[in-house]
Amino acid sequence: MTEFWKIHSKGATVEEMMLDSSASTLSQFEKPEILSLLPSIDDAKVLELGAGIGRFTGHLAKQASHVTAVDFMQTFLDKNRELNRDHGNIKFLQADVTQLQFPENSFDVVFSNWLFMYLTDEELLQLVNSMLRWLRPGGHLFFRESCFHQSGDSKRTFNPTIYRKPAQYNHIMQAGFQQANGNEKSFGFELVISKSVQTYIKLKKNQNQVCWLLEKVSRENAGHQGYATFQQFLDGKQYSRQGILRYEKIFGEGYVSTGGPDTTKEFVSLLDLQAGQKVLDVGCGIGGGNFYMAKAFKVDVLGMDLSSNMVEIAMERATEDSTLLVQFEISDATKREFPEESFDVVYSRDTILHIADKFALFKRFYRWLKPGGKLLITDYCCGEKPWTSKFEDYVKQRGYILYSVSKYGKFLEEAGFQNVRAEDRTDQFVDILNKELERTKSIQDEFIKEFSEDDYSYIVDGWSKKLERCEAGDQKWGLFYAERPINASNGV
């Protein structure tokens, strides 16, 4: 590693730092984008790892109370010190990050740009645990890495970079663990957002530059069936990569929600999409609906999902047609922040069933929509209680929070929406389930060959049980349409 950076640090230029001949142009647009993703650093103590020649150091120092800038290449650090000599709140430290020592709770934010991809999995996990100790509770870690493959065009006689998949970073980050003194409470990282750097998409048609923002939070496994975070529950239990592809085989290419492309076309037609509009898809899955909307209506779509496995597949598919205005991010809709009036449409298919406080989420949707903006949701709902014991067990096992169709619609009205339509589409749901079950049985041999006999049985049994729950009146399927009033304010 030292040898690699000795070769690429002789001039301490931005081209060497970014390993790209167009670095100056990229940096001009990328820098404000990266900084805009940070949490507030006003009066914060910031640790910058891999500070390099100081592309970000000075900007951090303008707002933070103090910045500790660390890099293991003295030539880069000397250039950083020269460029940022007017800032009196920066400490420059030449060190290997794997050997760093700081007191517990020393920093509010840890910032890193292109560093972790030079560490082994073992070194990175060790650093994750260290950063958890160094950060105060509620503190944030921001980092950005090259994923999948090389992005810069600089020639390299050898390349020690580890081009991980985004899901691998998620798994390593969430494996980190800090036991607090007295064994009272443990801490770990929880994802706030992970997304591709838009500058690279626009200028280089490259979705492989990915950044993350995580928060140090207390850990309680009880709430996620033994998993440390809800995201781990989704990726490890319900939406493993194999499980996602298994669902796609039933729903149709690109889809993991009821009815696949057919219901997507039906429901999207209700939105009267116009070219240039901005659409937010909450729980985008593997992106089929996003690609359809972008291609058919020339809209700009942002797909968000908490499952890193889902988004990783969507990002892989996005590289097949770089002309489509589609972006994907791993994020939690209950924590994500967008500027008010950012979108013309918010769209969500069979996803909000995982979220407990639906009313609070709908208020967020309201703020994010422009006046006159439209909301379209399909979601699992429930019949009136008491439920059967089988349905109680099913809901608990899946971690669902379900309401009746009418209650769901009432939440939307209370959040400020108008022209609310809350339709019980259970009959359509049953019809779709029967067709999907029939189609699955017709390709039994093909399905088993591609997946396994257990996977086939899982689908057939699962769909049959959905039909039973609908027959019993426990499980419902709702379609919801609503609009933000044209003259309403955001003060809901």
Language-model features: locations:
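Class I SAM-dependent methyltransferase SAM/SAH-binding core
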Residues: 47, 52-99, 280-282, 286-335
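A short acidic, Gly/Pro-enriched loop at the edge of an enzyme's catalytic core
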Residues: 100-110, 335-345
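A short SAM/SAH-binding and catalytic strip from SAM-dependent methyltransferases
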Residues: 108-122, 345-357
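Conserved catalytic/acceptor-binding region of the Class I
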Residues: 149-154, 161-171, 175-182, 372-429
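Class I (Rossmann-like) S-adenosyl-L-methionine-dependent methyltransferase catalytic domain
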Residues: 1-43, 49-101, 119-126, 140-230, ...
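Conserved Class I S-adenosyl-L-methionine
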Residues: 185-226, 421-492
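A short glycine-rich, Lys/Arg-flanked "PGG" loop and its adjoining helix->strand segment in the class I
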Residues: 125-137, 359-374
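Short helix-loop-beta connector
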Residues: 39-45, 272-278
